[in-house]
Amino acid sequence: MQNLLEALVSRSLVHDQTPGLQARLAQGPITGYVGFDPTADSLHVGHLLAVMSLAWLQRCGGTPIIVVGGGTGMVGDPSGKRSERPVLSVEEIDRNVAAIRAQLERFVSFEGQNAARVRNNADWLRAIGLMEFLRDVGKHFTVNYMLAKDSVKGRMESGISFTEFSYQLIQAYDFWHLFRSEKCELQMGGSDQWGNITAGAELVSRKDGASVHGLTFPLLTTASGTKFGKTEGGAVWLDPARTSPYKFFQFWLNTDDRDVERLLKFFTFLSVEEIAALLAEQARDPGKRPAQRRLAEDVTARVHGPDVTRSVVEASRILFGGTDLRAASADVLEVLAGEIPSATVTGDELAALTVADLLVKVGLAASKGEVRRGVAGRGFSLNGAVLESGDAKVAAGDLLAGGYALLQKGKRNYALVKVR
């Protein structure tokens, strides 16, 4: 069975590690955890490095623990933050925890010998009293030690509340609790979590005289220098209600050539050899972008499932060429309807409207005069066929699957009409 550290290093997924981790992994599989902040009801692609690390841990024989911060979520981690986060209610956090667990099921198995486990740190943090916490945790850390952490130093000028200042002690207590209760010996997280992770290892060492380990992932930025996972529209979410599967697919498909090798290593389970073969194919015919297509299909299928991915891929082909519209299913056209301008008409309305009326209705033309000029220049089409006259009408037999008609202006402007 592959060694976890070797697997992660081969994919450039390790930024830092505590001494002795390699020796510990050589002894056999390990139980490890990653913490997730439950301030939203969905993970986003910025969380996927952590999620993939848990998946690799399980593939290498280890037992992954997902710690959802129901307790720490009520405090707020200052790491990488310029201001204090809003405090959520217990009810909000519980709803978010349930939603996040459902998303993680796409990546790790909750069945079998080394089944993944979900833990909410509120279960143990709510049970400990202040005096007990100060006695059992606080006495093991000096204020100087806590002030030296980058997550704290970065906030000293702007101000940091005692609530956030104490966060590293609470996360340290998580690590100690999991070590005691579940023999968890590894915590993983982003590079900004290094201070919190080492605080936990320090607490375990001081209280139990044992060695536990930490591993962090690199900060992921794109070749253009922007933070990975951010678009003009904001974060790219795993929840289809927040980011549609089509937009999710397009996010990965639009990966810069300079980033695609790294993202294939980070976010797929393709072997290093398979990735090299994809890149060689891409070098022979860059226009087809096989590496980006495989990346987009692989990640979308894992997050949204293979059926949704097939519909999304087909919808993408409709807009960018390479498919027969008549063969498109109603599901595929429904995906498109959520991504391009659309209008719904009744059968009676369709019979009364010309194609020019429909083009104006969906916003592809400002007026019938614009349609006439566009038709003269062969600039409009209906279901892939160049429009010869704006006065034509769409018959029932002209409709695509599901009662759709696809209108097009130029090469890249589309709209759908749905007949109900």
UniProtKB/Swiss-Prot annotation:
Chain ranges for the short sequence motif 'KMSKS' region as given in the UniProt record: 227-231
GO biological process per UniProt: tyrosyl-tRNA aminoacylation
Gene3D superfamilies given in the database record: HUPs, RNA-binding S4 domain, Tyrosyl-Transfer RNA Synthetase
GO molecular function annotations of the record: ATP binding; RNA binding; tyrosine-tRNA ligase activity
EC id: 6.1.1.1
Binding-site residues for ATP, renumbered to this chain: K230
Transmembrane segments: none
Reaction catalysed by this enzyme: tRNA(Tyr) + L-tyrosine + ATP = L-tyrosyl-tRNA(Tyr) + AMP + diphosphate + H(+)
GO terms under cellular component: cytosol
Motif placement: 'HIGH' region: 38-47
Residues that coordinate or bind L-tyrosine: Y33, Y167, Q171
Superkingdom of origin: Bacteria
Location(s) in or outside the cell: Cytoplasm
Pfam families tied to this protein: SYY_C-terminal, tRNA-synt_1b
InterPro entries in UniProt: aa-tRNA-synth_I_CS, aa-tRNA-synth_Ic, Rossmann-like_a/b/a_fold, S4_RNA-bd_sf, SYY-like_C, Tyr-tRNA-ligase, Tyr-tRNA-ligase_bac-type, Tyr-tRNA-ligase_bac_1
Domain S4 RNA-binding: 353-419
UniProt keyword annotations, A-Z: Aminoacyl-tRNA synthetase, ATP-binding, Cytoplasm, Ligase, Nucleotide-binding, Protein biosynthesis, RNA-binding
Assembly: Homodimer.
PANTHER family for this protein: TYROSINE--TRNA LIGASE, MITOCHONDRIAL, TYROSYL-TRNA SYNTHETASE
Known function: Catalyzes the attachment of tyrosine to tRNA(Tyr) in a two-step reaction: tyrosine is first activated by ATP to form Tyr-AMP and then transferred to the acceptor end of tRNA(Tyr).
Protein family membership: Belongs to the class-I aminoacyl-tRNA synthetase family. TyrS type 1 subfamily.
HAMAP family (UniProt xref): Tyr_tRNA_synth_type1 (MF_02006)
The protein's name in its UniProt record: Tyrosine--tRNA ligase
Organism: Anaeromyxobacter dehalogenans (strain 2CP-1 / ATCC BAA-258)
